[in-house]
Amino acid sequence: MFNAKHFFNLGLGFQWLQKRGIGSLKRPYNFPKPVPGPKHKDVLSLFEKKCRSVLDEQSERFKMFHRSQPNRVRPGAVLLVESYSKYPSKDSVNRFAGYLLRIRHRGPKSSILLRNVVMGVGVEYLLPIYSPQIKRIVVLKENGLSKRPRRAYLSYLRQPRFRLPPVESLVRKYIEQNQHKP
């Protein structure tokens, strides 16, 4: 057992500690018990799964875009996105169709970049995949380009020499097919 009085009376020059009250502790300090660690090794992936389960209940969008899925949508595909224009009230729906230029994999913050030419002007639309504002994402054509692109980011499609075929005919065909269904 440590005796503070005996230690300070040794004459080793520790009187200044006594004056500051350090030697006045009668019993040793009891430290609190350590907090238990997380049950899972990768806490971040567990959090992402939980967020994804809330935002994407049937995990349709996860299967559509995640790298681990063999039948995922790849850049170059033609997509139709239906989103709510005034989100809390789900009255009106906006549609945007375009070529998929890029997929950003950032967990719950993953997003896609679509491009289309509207009235001669190139329009790009960056939208988060798991946003509750998006009603549905439909694949109109797996590969809208002539051959399969070998890049993850098709930024070269912005150049004027790469004229993309119009998407309007695919959108009209999709709308006609779905209007007749009850």
Swiss-Prot record:
Binding partners and assembly: Component of the mitochondrial large ribosomal subunit (mt-LSU). Mature yeast 74S mitochondrial ribosomes consist of a small (37S) and a large (54S) subunit. The 37S small subunit contains a 15S ribosomal RNA (15S mt-rRNA) and at least 32 different proteins. The 54S large subunit contains a 21S rRNA (21S mt-rRNA) and at least 45 different proteins.
Source organism (scientific name): Schizosaccharomyces pombe (strain 972 / ATCC 24843)
Main function: Component of the mitochondrial ribosome (mitoribosome), a dedicated translation machinery responsible for the synthesis of mitochondrial genome-encoded proteins, including at least some of the essential transmembrane subunits of the mitochondrial respiratory chain. The mitoribosomes are attached to the mitochondrial inner membrane and translation products are cotranslationally integrated into the membrane. bL19m is essential for respiration.
Family stated for the protein in its record: Belongs to the bacterial ribosomal protein bL19 family.
Transit peptide: 1-21
Molecular function GO labels: structural constituent of ribosome
Record localization: Mitochondrion
Pfam families documented for this protein: Ribosomal_L19
An individual GO BP term: mitochondrial translation
Chain's gene name: img1
An annotated GO cellular component: mitochondrial large ribosomal subunit
Keyword annotations from UniProtKB, A to Z: Mitochondrion, Ribonucleoprotein, Ribosomal protein, Transit peptide
Name of the featured protein: Large ribosomal subunit protein bL19m
